[in-house]
C-alpha cells in the first residue's frame, strides 16, 4: 500500500493505527483503586434510566435525600407521564388500525393534546376512506383507467372536431 494521498480523497489524512496514536490505551497508567473511588463519588447517576452505566433504577435506599420542591416536581412528572400513557392507551383502543408508533407521533405532534390528536386522527381517517374510493384493486405501473369521465370525452371530441374541420395549425411568427 502506498503512503501518501489517496486518489479517492487527496485531502484525507493518513490512517494511524490506534496503538500508535497519541494518548492510546497502551501509554496510559494503570488506574488505582483510590482513583476509581474518587471518580465514582463524583458521578451522580440519573436514576430510572440507567445513564452512565449505572444500570436501572436503584430504589430509594441508594437515592440521596431530596428537597420538598424536587419531590413535588418529580411527582408532577410522574403524573404527566401517567396521563400521557393513559391518553396513548385510549387512542390505541379507539383506533385499532393504527400502530402505536403512528399514534405516538400524532400525539407528540399535537403537543400531547388529546382533543387535537383525536381531531387529526378523525381527519386522517376520513381522507383515507375517500382516497380508497379512487384506488384500483391492484396497483401496477401499466394500469390504464378503464372508465373515461364525460369531461375528458368532451375534450377529446372537441379537439378531434377542430382538426377534422379542415383548420390546420399554421405557423405563427412573432416578429
Curated annotation (Swiss-Prot):
<protein>
    <recommendedName>
        <fullName>Polyadenylate-binding protein-interacting protein 6</fullName>
    </recommendedName>
</protein>
<dbReference type="InterPro" id="IPR038981">
    <property type="entry name" value="CID5/CID6"/>
</dbReference>
<feature type="region of interest" description="Disordered">
    <location>
        <begin position="145"/>
        <end position="175"/>
    </location>
</feature>
<dbReference type="InterPro" id="IPR003892">
    <property type="entry name" value="CUE"/>
</dbReference>
<dbReference type="InterPro" id="IPR041806">
    <property type="entry name" value="CID5/6/7_CUE"/>
</dbReference>
<dbReference type="GO" id="GO:0043130">
    <property type="term" value="F:ubiquitin binding"/>
</dbReference>
<feature type="short sequence motif" description="PAM2-like">
    <location>
        <begin position="7"/>
        <end position="17"/>
    </location>
</feature>
<feature type="domain" description="CUE">
    <location>
        <begin position="83"/>
        <end position="126"/>
    </location>
</feature>
<feature type="compositionally biased region" description="Polar residues">
    <location>
        <begin position="166"/>
        <end position="175"/>
    </location>
</feature>
